[in-house]
UniProtKB/Swiss-Prot annotation:
GO cellular component terms listed in the entry, alphabetical order: extracellular space
Basic residues bias spans: 82-100
Effect ascribed to mutating C75S: Inhibits migration of nonactivated dendritic cells and monocytes
Pfam families for this protein: CXCL17
Posttranslational modification: Likely to undergo an endoproteolytic process to form a four-cysteine-containing mature peptide with a canonical CXC chemokine scaffold after secretion.
Source organism (scientific name): Homo sapiens
Protein name per UniProt: C-X-C motif chemokine 17
Length: 119
């Protein structure tokens, strides 16, 4: 009985990881590419990889806090647009802008990494 439970616990993370990787289907549609692609592109263009733990410790106002020894490149969630008046077309479109999507993807990757660390 204990062996069965322990084997199921070992298989659970593998199943979760396969489900996550299979849900990222890059060939679905033009606007629905691989979710990690935006962050990878950001890193390839010279963006410094952000530390997830540093981001979650930041102030709620989202002011950029530099970590000593690191260059002052900003993470996807560091800068955001203030209150910009929306046009009539934008008001009815609920799709978030590219920046907030990049921020959401970054935070999602941080959460996935935090789940993978204890294993």
């Amino acid at each position: 009985m204990k062996v069965l439970i322990s084997s199921l616990l070992l298989l659970l993370p593998l199943m979760l990881m396969s489900m996550v990787s299979s849900s990222l289907n890059p060939g679905v549609a033009r606007g629905h590419r691989d979710r990690g692609q935006a962050s990878r592109r950001w890193l390839q263009e010279g963006g410094q990889e952000c530390e997830c733990k540093d981001w979650f410790l930041r102030a709620p106002r989202r002011k950029f806090m530099t970590v000593s020894g690191l260059p002052k490149k900003q993470c996807p969630c560091d800068h955001f647009k203030g209150n910009v008046k929306k046009t009539r077309h934008q008001r009815h479109h609920r799709k978030p802008n590219k920046h907030s999507r990049a921020c959401q993807q970054f935070l999602k990757q941080c959460q996935l990494r935090s789940f993978a660390l204890p294993l």
